[in-house]
C-alpha cells in the first residue's frame, strides 16, 4: 500500500495524488491518505480514487479540543475488512464521543472557513517580515505546489508553518513564542484555540522532503476574529 499525507507535515508539500493513484492501480496497491488537514470540506479523496481515508476527529471535526478519536473510511470493498478488524480488536468509541463529533460536524464548514481566512491573512502578513525566510502555506502564490493545490483542493485550513532565517537562534524563536499574546503553546490544532509550537524539522521528520528547513515555527489559527486582537499585538 501507499500512504499519503497531503499536505506534508511541517513543510506542507502538496502530493500529486492523481499520479499516486495511477501508480497504485498499475501495481495493484491500496492507497491510503490522511485527510485531517483539509477535511472533506476542502478535499474528497474518494473523488480521486483513494481506497482508504484516515482523519483525526480530534482536530477540525471535533473542533472543541475535547475528544480524542479518529476515523477510518473505505469504499464498499474495503469497508467490510475495516469493520471486521474493528470488531475483532474491540476498537469502538463511546456514544458520547460520537454525539460530540456530530456536534462538531454541524459547525465544521463555518469554523473551517473562518480558520482558513485568518490563517491566510496572517501568512501574508508574515511574508513581509525580514526575520522570516519562508512561509509554508499552499494558498500563497509563491508556494512551490500552489498550482497543484489549486487543482485538487477547494480551500486551505488554518494550519501552516514559517521558517526563520539561519541567523535567528532557536532560543530567540522560543522567546518570540513565549511572548505571543494571541497564540498559546501547543502541538495540537483544529480546536477553538490559536496555538503555535516550535521545532527543528530536520530532527522531527523521518523522511526527507525536497526542502528541509533548518528550523521551523509551526502555527495554527483558530476562528478567533483577528480585528478584536489588534490593540494587543
Where are these regions (language model features)?
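Short coil/turn linker and secondary-structure boundary residues
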Residues: 15, 77, 167-171, 226
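Conserved PLP-enzyme active-site core in the AAT-like
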Residues: 1-131, 136
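Ubiquitous "structural anchor" signal
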Residues: 71, 78, 198-199, 224
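Hydrophobic side chains in well-ordered alpha-helices
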Residues: 82, 172-176, 227
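Conserved C-terminal alpha-helix-loop-beta "cap" of PLP-dependent enzymes
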Residues: 134-222
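Conserved small/polar residues in nucleotide/adenosyl-binding loops
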Residues: 224-231
Amino acid at each position: 500500500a501507499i500512504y499519503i499525507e497531503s499536505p506534508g507535515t511541517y513543510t506542507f508539500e502538496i502530493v500529486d495524488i492523481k499520479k499516486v493513484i495511477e501508480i497504485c492501480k498499475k501495481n495493484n496497491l491500496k492507497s491510503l491518505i490522511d485527510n485531517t488537514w483539509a477535511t472533506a470540506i476542502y478535499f474528497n479523496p474518494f473523488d480521486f480514487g483513494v481506497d482508504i481515508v484516515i482523519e483525526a476527529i480530534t482536530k477540525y471535526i471535533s473542533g472543541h479540543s475535547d475528544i480524542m478519536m479518529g476515523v477510518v473510511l473505505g469504499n464498499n470493498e474495503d469497508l467490510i475488512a475495516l469493520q471486521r478488524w474493528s470488531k475483532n480488536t474491540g476498537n469502538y468509541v463511546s456514544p458520547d464521543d460520537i454525539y460530540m463529533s456530530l456536534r462538531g460536524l454541524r459547525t465544521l464548514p463555518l469554523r473551517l472557513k473562518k480558520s482558513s481566512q485568518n490563517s491566510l491573512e496572517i501568512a501574508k502578513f508574515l511574508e513581509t517580515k525580514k526575520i522570516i525566510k519562508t512561509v509554508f502555506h499552499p494558498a500563497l502564490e509563491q508556494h512551490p505546489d500552489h498550482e497543484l493545490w489549486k487543482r485538487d483542493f477547494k480551500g486551505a485550513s488554518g494550519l501552516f508553518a514559517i521558517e526563520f532565517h539561519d541567523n535567528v537562534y532557536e532560543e530567540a524563536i522560543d522567546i518570540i513564542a513565549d511572548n505571543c499574546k494571541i497564540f498559546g503553546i501547543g502541538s495540537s490544532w483544529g480546536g477553538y484555540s490559536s496555538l503555535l509550537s516550535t521545532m527543528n524539522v530536520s530532527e522531527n521528520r523521518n523522511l526527507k522532503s525536497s526542502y528541509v528547513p533548518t528550523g521551523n515555527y509551526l502555527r495554527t489559527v483558530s476562528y478567533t476574529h483577528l480585528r478584536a486582537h489588534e490593540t494587543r499585538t
